[in-house]
């Protein structure tokens, strides 16, 4: 994992490890709403891998799982606050 140096403060940020590698999760289920909702912000957008720390493989899986859960109406496309 590459260390990132911030230009503004010259601090070194160590990236987060991939949650799915640490917990040794092999299958991500779209029906697991608690896990899926961790990767969505309060506006309903999918969080990037820079924020979540996921590797590219698991980030792709998470985005597909979120899209599948939205279609099955398990999670909303947008939040209630934005709809009004």
From Swiss-Prot:
Subunit structure and binding partners: Part of the 30S ribosomal subunit. Forms a tight heterodimer with protein bS6.
HAMAP family (UniProt xref): Ribosomal_bS18
Function recorded in the entry: Binds as a heterodimer with protein bS6 to the central domain of the 16S rRNA, where it helps stabilize the platform of the 30S subunit.
Protein name from the UniProt record: Small ribosomal subunit protein bS18
Family: Belongs to the bacterial ribosomal protein bS18 family.
Entry keyword set: Ribonucleoprotein, Ribosomal protein, RNA-binding, rRNA-binding
GO cellular component labels: cytosolic small ribosomal subunit
Naturally occurring in which organism (per UniProt): Mycoplasma mobile (strain ATCC 43663 / 163K / NCTC 11711) (Mesomycoplasma mobile)
Signal peptide: none
Gene3D superfamilies with a match to the protein in the record: Ribosomal protein S18
Cross-referenced Pfam families: Ribosomal_S18
SUPFAM superfamilies named in the record: Ribosomal protein S18
Any one of the GO BP annotations: translation
GO terms for MF: small ribosomal subunit rRNA binding; structural constituent of ribosome
